Structures are given as structure tokens and as C-alpha cells.
Amino acid sequence: TSDLNYLLSRRLEVEGRLRKGIENEEFFLRYQPQVDVATGRIVGMEALMRWNDPVKGEIFPKDFISVAEELGLIVQLGEWAFRTACRQLKGWEDEGVRDVSVAVNISPRQFMSRRLVASLLAIVREAGADPHRVEVEITDAGPNSLLGQPKTAALTANWPVPTF
């Protein structure tokens, strides 16, 4: 029971810090280059969410995404990440970088949303980014996800955001 108490207190701590982190805008994106192995040229960037917790420092998604999913905060975080990545893409476009795409991970819960396409299109338009250079990757993050696979499994489905 002491192990269970420890896990429960740790979980409650993460939940509280996660809510506060969203409120205090402690999340940020890192961009990992996607390289064409034939040419060595950077062809895209993958947006990777991180949490800059004031107590724990940089926290990786494996330590907070499942909690965000269970709390129903994942859609909010996913939309924030998509918006931030689209704004960054527009910034790169404004600087003359026009041949690079950006890929953003969304959760199965966000993918199942009825308003997903409308939401993503609105974000792309709001940012003024080229929708043909935005990719969405659907990640399988936990036991209640789209595929019902273990936490280590991942599904990536890339599709350019439509422009209709």
C-alpha cells in the first residue's frame, strides 16, 4: 500500500502541475529536422512538445501526455502545438524558407474529434501558413487510444491538411 500511496501522490502532483503548466504557458516546441538521406537536405521539421516545469525543468511527453489524455487536456495541448507550429512555419516562410514542411503530432482523442478538420484548417488560415506544407502525425499514446496498443506502440499517419 505504500507503493500505491506513492504512485497516487505522484500522479496527483503531476495533474496539478500539468494544469498549472497549461495556465502559465510553460509548454514549448522543439523542432527536429527531417533530412532527405539521398541529398542530405533538410526537407521538414517535426514539432516536438516539451514542458518547461519551473521545478523539474524540461519534461518530455512520455512523462505527461498520458496524464493530459486522461484529464481531457490533450485536445487543448494539441491545438496549441498545431497553432504554434503553423506560426513558426509562417515565420520561416517570411524569412524565405519555402521548401520545408512541418509535422505536428496529435493524439487519437484529438483525431476522433468531429471538429478536427475545421479546427486545423482555421488554425492554418489564422497563421497564414502554406497548408500544403503542414503534416499531421497521429500518435498512439496509451491504452485507451485509437488502436488500444501498449504505450510504447506508435502509429504515424502523415497527411497534408486539405485546402477545400
For each predicted feature, which ranges?
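Bacterial c-di-GMP phosphodiesterase EAL domain
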Residues: 2-129, 141
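The catalytic core of metal-dependent phosphodiesterases that act on cyclic dinucleotides
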Residues: 101, 118-164
